[in-house]
Protein backbone atom coordinates (compact mmCIF):
# COMPACT_ATOMS: atom_id res chain seq x y z
CA UNK A 1 0.00 0.00 0.00
CA UNK A 2 1.19 3.53 -0.77
CA UNK A 3 0.23 6.39 1.52
CA UNK A 4 0.86 10.11 1.22
CA UNK A 5 1.48 12.01 4.45
CA UNK A 6 0.23 15.59 4.21
CA UNK A 7 0.80 17.57 7.39
CA UNK A 8 0.00 21.09 8.38
CA UNK A 9 -1.76 23.49 10.70
CA UNK A 10 -4.72 23.79 8.33
CA UNK A 11 -5.72 27.00 10.07
CA UNK A 12 -8.21 27.01 8.41
CA UNK A 13 -8.27 24.20 5.87
CA UNK A 14 -9.46 25.26 2.42
CA UNK A 15 -9.89 24.18 -1.17
CA UNK A 16 -6.21 24.77 -1.92
CA UNK A 17 -5.29 22.08 0.61
CA UNK A 18 -7.88 19.76 -0.93
CA UNK A 19 -6.41 20.43 -4.38
CA UNK A 20 -2.89 19.55 -3.17
CA UNK A 21 -4.27 16.33 -1.65
CA UNK A 22 -6.16 15.39 -4.82
CA UNK A 23 -3.16 16.09 -7.06
CA UNK A 24 -0.98 13.97 -4.76
CA UNK A 25 -3.44 11.06 -4.80
CA UNK A 26 -3.78 11.17 -8.58
CA UNK A 27 -0.19 11.86 -9.65
CA UNK A 28 1.53 9.67 -7.01
CA UNK A 29 -1.03 6.85 -7.50
CA UNK A 30 -1.66 6.73 -3.74
CA UNK A 31 -3.99 4.26 -2.07
CA UNK A 32 -4.57 6.74 0.75
CA UNK A 33 -3.53 10.19 1.88
CA UNK A 34 -3.30 10.89 5.61
CA UNK A 35 -4.19 14.54 6.19
CA UNK A 36 -2.29 15.17 9.43
CA UNK A 37 -3.58 18.17 11.38
CA UNK A 38 -0.88 19.33 13.77
CA UNK A 39 -1.75 20.62 17.24
CA UNK A 40 0.77 23.43 16.71
CA UNK A 41 3.58 24.54 14.45
CA UNK A 42 6.80 25.51 16.28
CA UNK A 43 7.56 28.01 13.48
CA UNK A 44 4.21 29.84 13.69
CA UNK A 45 2.49 32.04 16.24
CA UNK A 46 0.10 29.80 18.19
CA UNK A 47 -2.08 32.73 19.32
CA UNK A 48 -3.82 32.69 15.93
CA UNK A 49 -4.32 28.92 15.98
CA UNK A 50 -7.91 27.68 16.10
CA UNK A 51 -8.56 24.71 18.41
CA UNK A 52 -7.39 21.36 17.05
CA UNK A 53 -10.93 19.93 17.23
CA UNK A 54 -12.24 22.75 15.01
CA UNK A 55 -9.44 22.33 12.45
CA UNK A 56 -10.05 18.56 12.37
CA UNK A 57 -13.79 19.07 11.81
CA UNK A 58 -13.22 21.63 9.06
CA UNK A 59 -10.57 19.40 7.44
CA UNK A 60 -13.10 16.55 7.32
CA UNK A 61 -15.52 18.88 5.52
CA UNK A 62 -12.91 20.02 2.99
CA UNK A 63 -11.41 16.56 2.33
CA UNK A 64 -14.19 14.94 0.32
CA UNK A 65 -12.25 12.06 -1.27
CA UNK A 66 -12.79 8.81 0.70
CA UNK A 67 -9.09 7.98 0.27
CA UNK A 68 -8.24 10.99 2.46
CA UNK A 69 -8.02 10.13 6.16
CA UNK A 70 -7.98 13.18 8.43
CA UNK A 71 -5.88 12.51 11.53
CA UNK A 72 -4.37 14.17 14.59
CA UNK A 73 -1.39 11.80 14.80
CA UNK A 74 1.01 14.31 16.37
CA UNK A 75 -1.46 14.91 19.19
CA UNK A 76 -2.06 11.17 19.57
CA UNK A 77 1.69 10.47 19.67
CA UNK A 78 2.35 13.46 21.97
CA UNK A 79 5.14 14.73 19.73
CA UNK A 80 5.88 18.19 18.42
CA UNK A 81 8.08 17.71 15.39
CA UNK A 82 7.34 16.18 11.99
CA UNK A 83 10.52 14.08 12.06
CA UNK A 84 9.34 12.37 15.26
CA UNK A 85 5.83 11.83 13.91
CA UNK A 86 7.13 10.31 10.69
CA UNK A 87 9.48 7.95 12.54
CA UNK A 88 6.61 6.72 14.72
CA UNK A 89 4.35 6.25 11.69
CA UNK A 90 7.01 4.29 9.83
CA UNK A 91 7.72 2.05 12.85
CA UNK A 92 4.00 1.32 13.29
CA UNK A 93 3.49 0.55 9.57
CA UNK A 94 6.60 -1.24 8.28
CA UNK A 95 4.84 -2.69 5.20
CA UNK A 96 3.52 0.63 3.90
CA UNK A 97 5.29 2.79 1.34
CA UNK A 98 5.07 6.40 2.48
CA UNK A 99 5.74 9.68 0.72
CA UNK A 100 5.79 13.08 2.42
CA UNK A 101 3.56 15.56 0.56
CA UNK A 102 3.99 19.30 0.88
CA UNK A 103 2.89 22.42 -0.93
CA UNK A 104 5.73 24.24 -2.66
CA UNK A 105 5.01 27.33 -0.57
CA UNK A 106 6.47 25.47 2.44
CA UNK A 107 9.71 24.62 0.67
CA UNK A 108 11.33 28.01 1.35
CA UNK A 109 11.24 27.36 5.11
CA UNK A 110 11.67 23.57 5.09
CA UNK A 111 15.34 23.94 6.13
CA UNK A 112 14.12 25.53 9.38
CA UNK A 113 12.18 22.40 10.36
CA UNK A 114 13.62 20.27 13.17
CA UNK A 115 15.79 17.56 11.54
CA UNK A 116 14.66 18.41 8.00
CA UNK A 117 17.56 16.51 6.45
CA UNK A 118 16.49 13.40 8.37
CA UNK A 119 13.00 13.71 6.86
CA UNK A 120 14.44 13.96 3.34
CA UNK A 121 16.84 11.07 3.93
CA UNK A 122 14.09 8.76 5.23
CA UNK A 123 11.01 9.67 3.18
CA UNK A 124 10.49 10.36 -0.50
CA UNK A 125 9.05 13.87 -0.86
CA UNK A 126 6.46 15.14 -3.33
CA UNK A 127 6.33 18.91 -3.64
CA UNK A 128 3.08 20.14 -5.16
CA UNK A 129 3.13 23.42 -7.08
CA UNK A 130 1.56 26.46 -5.39
CA UNK A 131 1.14 30.01 -6.73
CA UNK A 132 4.35 32.00 -6.52
CA UNK A 133 6.53 28.93 -5.95
CA UNK A 134 7.02 27.50 -9.43
CA UNK A 135 10.20 29.40 -10.25
CA UNK A 136 11.64 29.81 -6.76
CA UNK A 137 11.59 26.21 -5.50
CA UNK A 138 14.95 25.31 -7.08
CA UNK A 139 16.69 27.97 -4.98
CA UNK A 140 15.44 26.46 -1.70
CA UNK A 141 18.03 24.90 0.57
CA UNK A 142 16.31 21.49 0.34
CA UNK A 143 16.33 21.52 -3.47
CA UNK A 144 20.00 22.52 -3.50
CA UNK A 145 21.07 20.05 -0.80
CA UNK A 146 19.28 17.15 -2.46
CA UNK A 147 19.61 18.23 -6.11
CA UNK A 148 21.07 14.84 -7.08
CA UNK A 149 17.98 13.11 -5.65
CA UNK A 150 15.42 14.99 -7.73
CA UNK A 151 13.28 12.88 -10.04
CA UNK A 152 11.46 14.15 -13.08
CA UNK A 153 7.76 14.39 -12.29
CA UNK A 154 6.95 11.67 -14.84
CA UNK A 155 8.29 9.27 -12.17
CA UNK A 156 5.81 10.54 -9.56
CA UNK A 157 3.76 7.29 -9.68
CA UNK A 158 6.73 5.31 -8.34
CA UNK A 159 8.10 7.92 -5.91
CA UNK A 160 6.68 6.23 -2.79
CA UNK A 161 8.61 3.06 -3.64
CA UNK A 162 11.92 4.83 -4.29
CA UNK A 163 14.73 4.65 -1.77
CA UNK A 164 15.17 8.09 -0.20
CA UNK A 165 16.48 10.62 -0.60
CA UNK A 166 14.17 11.08 -3.58
CA UNK A 167 11.91 13.98 -4.41
CA UNK A 168 9.92 15.48 -7.23
CA UNK A 169 8.16 18.73 -8.03
CA UNK A 170 4.67 18.20 -9.42
CA UNK A 171 3.23 20.90 -11.65
CA UNK A 172 -0.50 21.22 -12.16
CA UNK A 173 -3.54 23.25 -11.29
CA UNK A 174 -2.95 25.72 -8.47
CA UNK A 175 -5.21 27.45 -6.01
CA UNK A 176 -4.48 30.95 -4.76
CA UNK A 177 -6.36 30.26 -1.51
CA UNK A 178 -4.26 30.85 1.59
CA UNK A 179 -4.98 30.14 5.26
CA UNK A 180 -3.24 33.39 6.21
CA UNK A 181 -5.42 35.41 3.83
CA UNK A 182 -8.58 33.62 5.02
CA UNK A 183 -7.74 34.42 8.66
CA UNK A 184 -7.24 38.09 7.76
CA UNK A 185 -10.67 38.18 6.10
CA UNK A 186 -12.23 36.52 9.16
CA UNK A 187 -10.61 39.11 11.45
CA UNK A 188 -12.01 41.97 9.36
CA UNK A 189 -15.51 40.45 9.52
CA UNK A 190 -15.40 39.77 13.26
CA UNK A 191 -17.11 42.36 15.45
CA UNK A 192 -14.59 44.49 17.29
CA UNK A 193 -14.38 44.05 21.06
CA UNK A 194 -14.70 47.40 22.81
Swiss-Prot record:
It catalyses: nicotinate beta-D-ribonucleotide + ATP + H(+) = deamido-NAD(+) + diphosphate. SUPFAM superfamilies: Nucleotidylyl transferase. The keyword Nucleus does not apply. One of its GO terms (molecular function) is ATP binding. GO terms for biological process: NAD biosynthetic process. It comes from the Bacteria. Its EC number is 2.7.7.18. It is an enzyme of class 2 (transferase). The keyword ATP-binding applies. Pathway: Cofactor biosynthesis; NAD(+) biosynthesis; deamido-NAD(+) from nicotinate D-ribonucleotide: step 1/1. Keywords: ATP-binding, NAD, Nucleotide-binding, Nucleotidyltransferase, Pyridine nucleotide biosynthesis, Transferase. Catalyzes the reversible adenylation of nicotinate mononucleotide (NaMN) to nicotinic acid adenine dinucleotide (NaAD). HAMAP family: NaMN_adenylyltr. Belongs to the NadD family. This is Probable nicotinate-nucleotide adenylyltransferase. It comes from Brucella abortus (strain 2308). The gene is nadD.
